[in-house]
Amino acid sequence: MSEGRTDGDTWGPAQSVGATATMVAAARAVASQGPDALLDDPLAEPLVRAVGLDPFIRIVDGKLDFPDDPLFNRRARAEQITVRTRFFDDFFIDATEGGLRQAVILASGLDTRAYRLAWPAGTVVYEIDQPQVIAFKTDTLANLGAAPTAERRTISIDLRDDWPAALREGGFDVTRPTAWSAEGLLPYLPPEAQDRLFDNITALSAPGSRLATEHVPDPNAFSDERLARISERWQRLGLNLNAADLFYRGERNVVADYLTGKGWRVTPHPARQLYARNGFEFPEDEMRATFGEMSYVDATLTGGRG
């Protein structure tokens, strides 16, 4: 890729932003392998194979590894995706145990939570993503004989468009508290679209709604140096992707502060603490150099709609 993002650009699971979703699914597949598997996502591997990108198939098959890379070797990548996946899994489990029966997975990609989590009876799970991505995953999992464990409703729309209207048209109930996830999404939105995303979530959320996302307190987290580090790793995989072409740069509002200002009670979970909680050693120097001081965020809407 030699050109940056444009308004209205689209993709499937093998192109552009979609290929990074497949990369994440490949990591989940690796973390789900073997007798000492860190995750249990049996649908990740067949989805990756169905996409058909050779580097990710080689990763899943154990034929491609970078043992000298403290962040990108097979074990480190499995631990990194395990920390992230368990955080969002636990978020949804806790939210539904607290009585929430409506969930929205923003930029759902090849996420399989609607198929693999034990959702309580009556739970409705909405998935929002690009039409090509939604169609690919739905058709592939149907061909595999996989069935959702909740009522799954798909909303095929770009998050830069009027997705709130599409969500309501899909049956979303604004009177019910909702569990929202925005996982691995924010760098792919322009700074103003990030704010608009949280504004829309707040406007659609009844009191008691919850939100999980990532949070980098540095408003200039995606510097040229950090993007170059990410791109170098992608290109070592054999992917002709440049992070500077996919991520939107520019100063952003700090997620935790912005949500607090919208009436959310925000609890940050620093990545290093989640690594320790999972029994993993945190790759301190390399993680900070590449991603900054990243935290995961669990927020609860305490008041009325903003």
Curated annotation (Swiss-Prot):
Pfam families: LCM
Gene3D superfamilies documented for this protein: Vaccinia Virus protein VP39
Listed EC numbers: 2.1.1.-
Function text: Exhibits S-adenosyl-L-methionine-dependent methyltransferase activity.
Superkingdom as given in the UniProt entry: Bacteria
Residues reported in the UniProt entry to bind S-adenosyl-L-methionine: 129, 158-159
Record's signal peptide: none
Keywords: Methyltransferase, S-adenosyl-L-methionine, Transferase
A GO term, aspect molecular function: methyltransferase activity
GO biological process, one term: methylation
InterPro entries: Ppm1/Ppm2/Tcmp, SAM-dependent_MTases_sf, SAM_mthyl_Trfase_ML2640-like
Keyword Cell membrane: no
Family: Belongs to the UPF0677 family.
Enzyme class (EC, first level): transferase
Protein name, per record: Putative S-adenosyl-L-methionine-dependent methyltransferase MAV_4442
Species of provenance: Mycobacterium avium (strain 104)
